[in-house]
């Protein structure tokens, strides 16, 4: 049975404080809340981390760079994550996938931003039209790690250590060699004890590991190579070599 109902405008309209419309939905190769793809590195690697997609003009107006950490803010909450340029979106629009909750991303995911309004007949929530603003975030101390082997066990052990970070993202990647990938950031360096815990759980605390430390800048770098291949690495303090090292892996 079809019902011919009168059009009703979205509950939340754009305004000066929240000039962007946030849309959300699923990605092709992720399964709902990742109950399946969250355990399969080959599937997870299709899109490794939650990204806020924005039109390039909107990014330029806010002086945002592709991959930069941003704060997405609505009337109900806020979320930190990287921004991604996507000119298939119209100016004034932004998109954030539904799949990432607080298991793989610090925070409550996109539902911390959406509104509770729903269609009076179908009861479908109004998840496609939340007013938001996006601004650059300065988190000077950054962290990146990649480690092969026992990815689920490592993830369960490492996840609690990042509760105090302003931003933390966890993902799986790899086809023949599954790996856990971690990206995090905060205002101040964590304690030496916490960093030692991270190194131990990443398998970077002993053995044939290349090490570089600059205590004055709170910078540390670790790379484990086995049989001519990178099998684990961490960059703490600054992560400029992240993409290059990941390509070598």
Report each predicted region and the residues it spans.
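Generic detector of well-ordered alpha-helical segments enriched in charged/polar residues
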Residues: 3, 195-199, 242, 246
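Histidine- and/or cysteine-centered catalytic micro-motif in compact active-site loops
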Residues: 25-27, 57, 75, 235
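Structured loops at beta-to-helix junctions and adjacent beta-edge loops in soluble globular domains
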Residues: 3-7, 23-26, 99, 137, ...
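Long, low-complexity segments enriched in small/aliphatic residues
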Residues: 1-39
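Long, contiguous, secondary-structure-rich segments that constitute the structural scaffold
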Residues: 17, 33, 37-53, 57-205, ...
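Flexible, glycine-rich terminal cap/loop adjacent to redox cofactors
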Residues: 212-249
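A generic local secondary-structure boundary/capping motif
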Residues: 9-12, 121-123, 221
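Short capping micro-motif at the N-terminus of alpha-helices
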Residues: 2, 81-83, 233
